[in-house]
C-alpha cells in the first residue's frame, strides 16, 4: 500500500480527516469487526483475518506478536488495540511489579501515591505492547459479602472519585501520544456493586436518586478528568441491562456530562441479553440494541459479528448506525499514534523498566502506607524476644498478591504465578528482621470441589469450583500452641484466600473459615501476647479471640513487598498511617454497614444486635497521639460549586513521628 496516496495513513492530516477517509473505505464486515474485542486465547487467525476485530484481550507476549503479524495481512492494516487487566500492576506479566490491591491503595488515602502506582503500571504495561487497561474500579462497596470488594476503593464516593481520578492521570500520563500512556477504563458503569445479597452481577435495585446521590458522582469525576473509556456493568437496573440503558448512557453520560470517550461492554454483555437475561430473542436483535444504545466496543461476544450483519440485512440496523462507534474506536487508534507505531512489545524497554529499582521502592512505600492498625494495647512495636509466627497465610505468596495477579486464574500463560523470589511473605519479612522466629501453620482453610452444575457457564466460561471449609486439625493446633508457649510473642496470620475472592466468588458468610477460629481461640488461651495480622481481601467478621488480641493489623493483599512492610510495622521501623476506606461489620447479618447511612424511623439497630460496625470507615491507629485544635472555617458563605476551606492545628503529643490524615465530614 502506497502511504502517500492514502489520506488515512498520512500522519500530517487531522485525525477527523483520517477517520473519515478510512471509514469510507471500510466494508460493513470491517466496521462490525472494529467494534469487537475478542479473547486472544481463542482462534487468533479467525479473529483478525475473518472477523476483522478491532481489539484483543488476555494476551500473552507470544500472542501479542502473532496478532500484530496477522494485522499486516489484512486489507486496510488497521492496528489492533491490545487490552489487559492491569488492575494493581501489570498483573499477568512475568516479573512485573504487583502493588497492593485497589482496596489496599485506598487505605493510604493518598491520591498522589495512587497516581504514581498507575504511572508505573503504565510504563511497565506499555513496554509489553499493552495499550489499554480495564482499571480503575469506581464501584461503591457496601455489602461485604460481594466477591469484588477488593477491587474497589471502598465505600465513600468522594474518596473513590479522588483516587480514581489520580489513577486515570497516572495511566494516561502526558497524553495518548506518550508511548508510555495506556487507556484507562472507568468501571463498572454504574451501580454494579449494589447486589442482591452480595451475589456478584445480580440485579441492582437502584432508584435514580440513589444513583445520582452515591454511585454516579465518582464516574462524573473521572469523565471530567478525561478517562478515555467507560466499561458497562453486567447487571440490569429496573429490568434494563446497563448495556442498553438509554437514561444512563444517553441522557446522563453523553448528555449531561458531555462524555465523548469510548464505551466498552463487560464480558459478553451483549450475549447475556440473549442467553442469560433473555431480553433479546437472538443475536441480531441484541446486536441492534447494543449499537443503537451507543456501545462502541463489544467485549467477547463472537456472535456479534454475524448478529450485526444479520441485523443490517433484516433492517434492524442501518450501516450508518455503526459509523459513530467505529469513528470513536478509530479516533482512539489515531490519537495513540498506532498507525505510525503500533507499539509492539519493546524488549529493551522491558529489560530496563519492568521491576525497576524505583518501582520496587514505590511498591514497598505503598505497602507500608496501606497497613491499618486497628488495635494495640501497647505490645507494638515489639520489644526483643522470640516470635512464633502461626497461621495458614503467613507464608502464602499468592494471597499477598490477591486477585487479578499471578496465578489468580485469569491468565493461562502464568500458571505458576509471579516468581517466588520477588514476593516477601510475612514469614519472610519477620525472618529478615528477627533472629529468633519459629513457624507453625496451625490450620488449613479450604479444599475445592467441582460445581455440580457443570464445569462451565452457558457462554463457555469456567465455573469456579465449590469451597469446602477444612475442619480444625488437632495436630496442627497443638503444634501452633507449642510454638506459642515457647515464644514471647505470637503473630497469627489469618484471613481469606483467592478462592474466596473475585468474580463469581461472593460469600454468604464473612467469618474466618476452616480451622482458623479454632486456632485463634487456642492461641488466646496460651496467655501469650497475640498480634493478629488479618491478611484479607476485604473486611471480615472476627471472633472474640481476635478482637481481644493484644494488637490487630488489617492488611488488604499488600503486593510483592507486603511481608517486608508488615514486619517493619510490627518492629516499629515504620509508623502505622493507614486508615480504613471501608467499615468492618460485627456480623454478616448487619449488611450493609457503610458509615453514611440515613437513620431509619426506628433507630439503627436490630432487636438482637446494634448496627454499629466493629471498625468504622476512617479508623486507624498510630504509635503516637495527635491533638487537634484551632479549627477555623475560612468560608463564611458557601455558594453552589464553591469549596469549603478550613484550617486546623495538629500537635504530636507523643514520642514518635506520625503521618496524620485529617478527615473532614460535611
Regions found by a protein language model. Give the residues of each.
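Glycoside hydrolase catalytic-domain context in secreted enzymes
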Residues: 1-666
Amino acid at each position: 500500500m502506497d502511504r502517500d496516496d492514502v489520506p488515512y495513513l498520512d500522519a500530517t492530516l487531522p485525525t477527523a480527516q483520517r477517520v473519515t477517509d478510512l471509514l469510507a473505505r471500510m466494508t460493513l464486515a470491517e466496521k462490525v469487526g472494529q467494534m469487537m474485542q475478542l479473547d486472544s486465547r481463542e482462534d487468533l487467525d479467525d479473529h483478525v483475518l475473518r472477523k476483522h476485530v478491532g481489539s484483543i484481550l488476555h494476551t500473552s507476549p507470544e500472542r501479542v506478536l502473532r496478532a500484530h503479524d496477522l494485522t499486516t495481512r489484512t486489507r486496510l492494516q488497521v492496528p489492533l488495540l491490545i487490552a489487559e487487566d492491569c488492575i494493581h500492576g501489570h498483573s499477568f506479566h512475568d516479573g512485573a511489579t504487583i502493588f497492593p490491591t485497589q482496596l489496599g491503595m485506598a487505605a493510604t488515602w493518598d491520591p498522589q501515591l495512587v497516581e504514581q502506582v498507575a504511572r508505573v503500571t503504565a510504563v511497565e504495561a506499555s513496554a509489553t505492547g499493552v495499550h489499554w487497561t480495564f482499571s480503575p474500579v469506581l464501584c461503591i462497596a457496601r455489602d461485604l459479602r460481594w466477591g469484588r470488594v477488593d477491587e474497589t476503593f471502598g465505600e465513600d464516593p468522594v474518596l473513590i472519585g479522588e483516587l480514581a481520578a489520580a489513577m486515570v492521570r497516572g495511566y494516561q500520563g502526558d497524553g495518548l501520544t506518550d508511548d508510555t500512556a495506556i487507556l484507562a477504563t472507568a468501571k463498572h458503569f454504574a451501580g454494579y456493586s449494589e447486589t442482591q445479597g452480595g451475589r456478584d452481577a445480580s440485579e441492582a435495585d437502584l432508584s435514580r436518586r440513589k444513583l445520582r446521590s452515591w454511585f454516579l458522582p465518582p464516574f462524573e469525576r473521572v469523565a471530567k478528568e478525561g478517562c478515555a473509556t467507560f466499561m458497562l456493568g453486567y447487571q440490569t437496573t429496573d429490568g434494563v441491562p446497563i448495556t442498553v440503558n438509554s437514561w444512563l448512557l444517553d441522557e446522563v453520560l453523553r448528555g449531561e456530562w458531555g462524555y465523548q470517550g469510548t464505551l466498552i461492554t463487560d464480558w459478553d454483555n451483549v450475549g447475556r441479553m440473549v442467553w442469560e437475561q433473555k431480553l433479546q430473542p437472538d443475536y441480531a436483535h441484541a446486536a441492534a440494541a447494543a449499537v443503537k444504545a451507543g456501545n462502541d466496543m463489544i467485549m467477547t461476544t463472537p456472535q456479534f459479528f454475524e448478529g450485526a450483519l444479520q441485523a443490517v440485512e433484516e433492517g434492524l440496523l442501518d450501516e450508518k448506525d455503526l459509523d459513530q462507534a467505529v469513528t470513536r474506536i478509530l479516533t482512539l487508534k489515531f490519537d495513540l499514534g498506532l498507525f505510525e507505531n503500533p507499539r509492539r512489545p519493546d524488549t529493551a524497554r522491558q529489560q530496563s523498566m519492568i521491576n525497576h529499582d524505583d518501582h520496587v521502592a514505590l511498591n514497598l512505600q505503598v505497602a507500608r502506607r496501606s497497613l491499618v492498625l486497628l488495635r494495640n494495647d501497647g505490645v507494638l512495636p515489639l520489644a526483643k524476644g522470640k516470635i512464633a509466627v502461626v497461621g495458614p497465610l503467613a507464608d502464602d505468596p499468592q494471597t499477598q498478591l490477591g486477585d487479578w495477579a499471578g496465578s489468580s486464574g485469569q491468565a493461562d500463560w502464568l500458571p505458576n504465578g509471579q516468581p517466588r523470589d520477588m514476593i516477601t511473605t510475612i514469614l519472610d519479612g519477620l525472618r529478615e528482621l528477627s533472629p529468633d522466629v519459629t513457624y507453625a501453620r496451625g490450620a488449613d482453610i479450604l479444599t475445592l470441589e467441582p460445581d455440580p452444575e457443570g464445569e462451565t457457564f452457558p457462554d463457555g466460561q469456567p465455573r469456579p469450583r465449590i469451597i469446602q471449609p477444612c475442619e480444625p486439625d488437632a495436630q496442627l493446633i497443638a503444634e501452633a500452641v507449642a510454638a506459642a508457649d515457647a515464644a514471647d510473642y505470637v503473630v497469627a496470620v489469618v484471613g481469606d484466600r483467592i478462592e474466596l475472592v473475585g468474580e463469581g466468588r461472593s460469600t454468604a458468610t464473612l467469618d474466618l473459615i476452616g480451622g482458623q477460629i479454632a486456632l485463634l481461640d487456642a492461641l488466646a488461651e496460651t496467655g501469650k501476647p497475640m498480634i493478629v495480622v488479618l491478611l484479607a481481601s476485604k473486611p471480615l467478621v472476627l471472633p472474640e479471640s481476635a478482637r481481644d488480641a493484644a494488637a490487630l493489623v488489617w492488611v488488604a493483599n499488600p503486593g510483592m513487598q507486603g511481608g517486608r512492610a508488615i514486619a517493619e510495622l510490627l518492629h516499629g521501623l515504620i509508623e502505622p498511617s493507614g486508615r480504613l476506606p471501608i467499615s468492618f461489620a460485627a456480623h454478616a447479618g448487619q449488611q450493609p454497614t457503610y458509615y453514611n447511612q440515613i437513620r431509619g424511623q426506628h433507630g439503627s439497630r436490630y432487636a438482637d444486635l446494634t448496627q454499629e460496625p466493629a471498625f468504622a470507615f476512617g479508623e486507624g491507629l498510630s504509635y503516637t497521639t495527635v491533638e487537634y485544635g484551632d479549627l477555623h472555617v475560612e468560608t463564611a458563605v458557601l455558594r453552589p460549586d464553591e469549596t469549603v476551606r478550613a484550617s486546623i492545628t495538629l500537635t504530636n503529643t507523643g514520642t514518635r513521628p506520625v503521618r496524620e490524615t485529617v478527615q473532614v465530614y460535611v
